[in-house]
């Protein structure tokens, strides 16, 4: 199984992908580098598939990966609740392909290719 190392140790890489996945679930659209977005895509697709399954085991598997951050301060809903109650039902009839990557220009400081990754 291949993956991108993203210039980090395995623990740092896992933490980065957890943070990005949680942010994408909360905001439904983030701007990041192309390599990070391509790695993030597979992680988020798996989380949404767990959300579609909806049983207790799937919820616990997703909770082990998604960070406990508040998604909506008015309702007190966290990222996991948003995944299972808002995002997963939206894709109930869709078999994969829940994200879209749109290319932007290069980043000003180092010229890294930037993209916007969003939920379809």
UniProtKB/Swiss-Prot annotation:
It comes from the Bacteria. The keyword Plastid does not apply. GO terms for biological process: translation. The keyword Ribosomal protein applies. One of its GO terms (molecular function) is structural constituent of ribosome. Belongs to the bacterial ribosomal protein bL17 family. Part of the 50S ribosomal subunit. Contacts protein L32. This is Large ribosomal subunit protein bL17. It comes from Geobacillus sp. (strain WCH70). The gene is rplQ.
